Amino acid sequence: MSKSLQAIRGMNDILPAQTPTWRYLESTFAQLLESYGYSEIRLPILEFTDLFARGIGEGTDVVDKEMYTFLDRNEESLTLRPEGTAGCVRAVLEHGMTGGGQVQKLWYTGPMFRYEKPQKGRYRQFHQIGVEVFNQPGPDIDAELIVLTARLWKQLGLADAVTLQLNSLGSSEARARYRDALVAYLQQRFEQLDEDSQRRLTTNPLRILDSKNAQTQALLTDAPTLHDYLDEESRAHFEGLKARLDAVGIAYEINPKLVRGLDYYGRTVFEWVTDKLGAQGTVCAGGRYDGLVSQFGGKPTPGVGFAMGVERLVLLLETLGLVPETLNPAPHAYICAFGEAAELAALALAERLRDELPGLRLLVNAGGGSFKSQFKKADKSGARYALILGDDELAGRVVGCKPLRDDSEQQSIAWDALPERLAACLEQV
């Protein structure tokens, strides 16, 4: 096959057999978010590159290695969004949505792009559902975000498959003090660090904490911990969050090495992880970013949010057999028409039934065919009834109704009575 007729590596088609699961996940979460008072915002997938360089941070893997960046015809550097928070912050600033202390509770969904090594659960084009809250500084809103995700897991049947991990990164001043202590500790052991961690020691030392290298992790056993450097305000914020989670019975683990991969986070960070998907265990992650709005030139504005990976959640639902069987239901009926006059009548009949029976799943045979071939297609469709129109039915103003899923006899039903009779039959299913 020609390369031009193949999807780009790491960018996948989502086929009709898969889309019902996607719609189920997206609609379930959308309804949940709306019940908590969140509003949808739709954001462009292209932004100026500087937005991500300033927001995510120079020296991060995302900015240095993973962004899809190019010059447009005006020589402007543009980037396909690698995440949603920076674009959402840009939007609320551009449209004055946080002025005067306005609280904004927003959500969005769509594709993100990162040049990573494709593997199961990790792609170069991937989809996220993101949630952002502005002008709510307290631990109560941090708790709400975690509580609503816990409710989503319960609705999806995933409550026993995921674990909540928490940490506090403290204030920027506390992180700076901790960074100095960590760098001093690791510089004495520089030769024992893996190559990637050696590079990060000068660019983004906190990211060494979540290194996947076993030897580096062993070195970190006796390293200083961030909690020893937390300022009192951050410590109180974290205790307030834990108290709220305890109050609603949400279990959590404190992970002092949880730092997240984006520089804008401070204070609360959290991840929901699973051991059911191998290496790609994080299905939802987020935290607080109180300094990001001012970093973009706005007034200091508290912010907190999270994003969840749709592909990973779909994979988790499929792996655990939690995709509802009713997501792609078979048609209720299939109209078989024999002859040109019957085909015209079938079209009119179908639209009348759709008018009178909202929600009716109805297929009309297309392309003609013999009695046998049309019945074969009706049966293959999974329809419960075949509705038959031919010259005799037209002459008698009736429709043949043949049950396809049991041995019941075919009936002739008057045109005018068909909607009521068909509705009664469907109610018995």
Swiss-Prot record:
GO BP term, example: histidyl-tRNA aminoacylation
Signal peptide (from-to): none
GO molecular function, a single term: ATP binding
EC number in record: 6.1.1.21
The organism's place on the tree of life at top rank: Bacteria
Protein localization: Cytoplasm
Any one GO cellular component localisation term in the record: cytoplasm
InterPro entries tied to this protein: aa-tRNA-synth_II, aa-tRNA-synth_II/BPL/LPL, Anticodon-bd, Anticodon-bd_dom_sf, His-tRNA-ligase, HisRS-like_core, HisRS/HisZ
Family annotation (Pfam families): HGTP_anticodon, tRNA-synt_His
Gene3D superfamilies (alphabetical): Anticodon-binding domain, Bira Bifunctional Protein, Domain 2
Record keywords: Aminoacyl-tRNA synthetase, ATP-binding, Cytoplasm, Ligase, Nucleotide-binding, Protein biosynthesis
Catalytic activity entry: tRNA(His) + L-histidine + ATP = L-histidyl-tRNA(His) + AMP + diphosphate + H(+)
Keyword Ligase appears in the UniProt entry: yes
Assembly information from the UniProt record: Homodimer.
Similarity annotation: Belongs to the class-II aminoacyl-tRNA synthetase family.
Protein's UniProt name: Histidine--tRNA ligase
UniProt source species: Stutzerimonas stutzeri (strain A1501)
Gene designation: hisS
